[in-house]
A protein has these predicted regions:
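Membrane-interface extramembranous regions
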Residues: 1-139
Length: 139
């Protein structure tokens, strides 16, 4: 695993797990509920949304926690985490772009989707590094 990939997986893992965990506590829990309501997403997806962020964070951290995993298993886990993160960030961008969602309930109070785009970029960069690693292993 390259140095950049190590940093990216640790960073994304810690961020996503922390973001998901904090959404269970006020005031962030209330903000997350408002985001869902004002963007017309199904109310039933609030809990799965919170849990899925924690799961993605755990998946990014799993190669660090289970050193006994094979390289192939680590690559598959990281690509799965990147794919789920991609979907989550597209939803987050959608939420940021909804006119009814006020800036004060969004991360850092920023209405433009700067945060989800930055996290999406890091996820794509991680997936690219994993893909390069897979290609190098095949050669």
């Amino acid at each position: 695993m390259s140095g950049r990939l190590k940093v990216l997986t640790l960073l994304l893992g810690a961020w996503m797990f922390m973001f998901g965990f904090l959404k269970f506590f006020q005031p962030i829990s209330g903000w997350f509920d408002v985001q869902f309501q004002q963007s017309h997403l199904p109310h039933q997806l609030i809990l799965p949304g919170k849990v899925s962020e924690m799961v993605v964070g755990f998946l990014f951290l799993l190669p660090w926690l289970r050193r006994s995993l094979t390289v192939r298993s680590k690559d598959q886990i990281l690509l799965t985490a990147c794919f789920i993160l991609l979907i989550q960030m597209f939803v987050a961008i959608y939420v940021h772009l909804q006119p009814g969602v006020p800036a004060n309930v969004l991360p850092f109070g920023i209405k433009p989707p700067v945060v989800p785009i930055a996290i999406l970029f890091l996820g794509v960069l991680t997936a690219f590094d994993v893909w390069k690693q897979i290609q190098a292993e095949k050669a």
